[in-house]
């Protein structure tokens, strides 16, 4: 038998929804939208780093970060 601890008593409400699944797709669509937005964000950062996306007055150089 598991021993009761004060930490377990505090964390028990967080585990009260264990095993319950929302019917249907739930928030899967919303998660997909956020994944797409995060992908676009990473793509823009990569293009700035590779100088594929040109921004006026913005130099991509490691030495400029130290100034």
UniProtKB/Swiss-Prot annotation:
GO terms assigned for molecular function = phosphate ion binding
Q: What is its main location?
A: membrane
Keyword Thylakoid set for record: yes
Q: Where in the cell is it found?
A: Cellular thylakoid membrane
Per the similarity annotation, which family is this?
Belongs to the PsbH family.
> What functional role does this protein have?
One of the components of the core complex of photosystem II (PSII), required for its stability and/or assembly. PSII is a light-driven water:plastoquinone oxidoreductase that uses light energy to abstract electrons from H(2)O, generating O(2) and a proton gradient subsequently used for ATP formation. It consists of a core antenna complex that captures photons, and an electron transfer chain that converts photonic excitation into a charge separation.
The protein in question is named Photosystem II reaction center protein H
Organism of derivation:
Gloeothece citriformis (strain PCC 7424)
The lineage is: Bacteria, Bacillati, Cyanobacteriota, Cyanophyceae, Oscillatoriophycideae
Q: Which gene encodes it?
A: psbH
């Amino acid at each position: 038998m598991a021993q009761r601890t004060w930490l377990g008593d505090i964390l028990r409400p967080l585990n009260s929804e264990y095993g319950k699944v929302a019917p249907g797709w739930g928030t899967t669509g919303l998660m997909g939208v956020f994944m797409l937005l995060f992908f676009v964000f990473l793509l823009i950062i990569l293009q700035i780093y590779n100088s594929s996306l040109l921004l006026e007055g913005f130099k991509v150089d490691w030495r400029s970060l130290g100034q």
